[in-house]
């Protein structure tokens, strides 16, 4: 297996313009494909997940052109639901941001379409979304294991009264919200359980509004969507920088700054993961906010005990930042780590122990006490981009760290290690 050993880093300083947000990129691509008119998307993320969405749209007859660096996409909308010319199988890798929204959107047509992906995708639950779509008339079969992809879709979604479980993934609600305006009937969506990652729903609602569709939101517990609507291209749309990707650089600034400035997001960002900066501030770093940037300056870091349900992806970065904080850090209400690219609670606990930390892994929490001195270890990444990027922070000590399968960062940030090296002064 390929590996990358990062030597100890003495200081991190400088600025980085963030690649586009994965969450925003894939939502914007789907809405542009469903919309009337031509849309020009700029600062699109070039990564595996976005390529899976683009490949699927192409197979569904959507015409688009990409710039040489794949960050600008000119896409001609279908002016309504996506249609396949015949029976079709779409391979979506391990891209939840493609699988969930497409599973819903493709229930508007009449074609037979199979959605499948990598082995890990077949372990990521989708049953709650399928149950909700069936309540709206969709005809869906499981091809292998009940409640998991691959799925066979045969259209049939018309809207109506629908319940969705909000406790596993906000992507299920996102998928229903983006599909419902194109259904023939009005749709009322009721959310059962505690809605996880609520800020991601704000991204969805924000983008739908940009594409000309408004819905009624009753305190995130009930959404009313008029049927028979159309999305309309906004013309040009700039994709915000990825706030989850910003977390690694901001944390590096907190641990070994200097000052690190990330551009492409700021105080007006629609992504909930910008709140990661508030957590670093609580831990002792200094944060400066601009409209289009966030800067973090080193401080003496101390442990925190916090509910991280609102920023589950960025919270992973706090788990490795905790190695540099005084005291025991507890991250709570993070059960949905278990249904991501890998079981991130298990993976994080396992790898933190390798570098010497004392770790308590609960059903939905993790408690981390740093060692007096970090140990050099080979870090397993579980084909999970965030594990690789989180554990790069271990090199901000006087100990090297070896990252196994470093190319797994291609899911959201193909040149992550080059960018980190550019801003780092070796010890």
UniProtKB/Swiss-Prot annotation:
> What protein name does the entry list?
3-phosphoshikimate 1-carboxyvinyltransferase
- Protein's cellular compartments: Cytoplasm
Question: MF terms per GO, please?
Answer: 3-phosphoshikimate 1-carboxyvinyltransferase activity
**Which residues participate in phosphoenolpyruvate binding?**
22, 96, 124, 171, 344, 386, 411
Please report which protein family the annotation says this sequence is part of. Answer: Belongs to the EPSP synthase family.
Q: Which gene encodes it?
A: aroA
Relate the assembly described in the record: Monomer.
> Entry's NCBIfam families?
aroA
Purpose of the protein: Catalyzes the transfer of the enolpyruvyl moiety of phosphoenolpyruvate (PEP) to the 5-hydroxyl of shikimate-3-phosphate (S3P) to produce enolpyruvyl shikimate-3-phosphate and inorganic phosphate.
EC number(s) on file: 2.5.1.19
What is any Pfam family matched here? EPSP_synthase
Annotated Gene Ontology cellular component terms: cytoplasm
The residue ranges crossing the membrane are none
List positions binding 3-phosphoshikimate: 22-23, 27, 169-171, 197, 313, 336, 340
Quick one: which pathway? Answer: Metabolic intermediate biosynthesis; chorismate biosynthesis; chorismate from D-erythrose 4-phosphate and phosphoenolpyruvate: step 6/7
One biological-process term from Gene Ontology? aromatic amino acid family biosynthetic process
**Catalytic activity, as annotated:** 3-phosphoshikimate + phosphoenolpyruvate = 5-O-(1-carboxyvinyl)-3-phosphoshikimate + phosphate
InterPro entries, per this entry?
A: Enolpyruvate_Tfrase_dom (IPR001986), Enolpyruvate_Tfrase_sf (IPR036968), EPSP_synthase (IPR006264), EPSP_synthase_CS (IPR023193), RNA3'P_cycl/enolpyr_Trfase_a/b (IPR013792)
**Where do the catalytic residues lie?**
313
User: Enzyme group, top EC level?
Assistant: transferase
Query: Principal localization?
Result: cytoplasm
Keywords recorded for this protein, A-Z? Amino-acid biosynthesis, Aromatic amino acid biosynthesis, Cytoplasm, Transferase
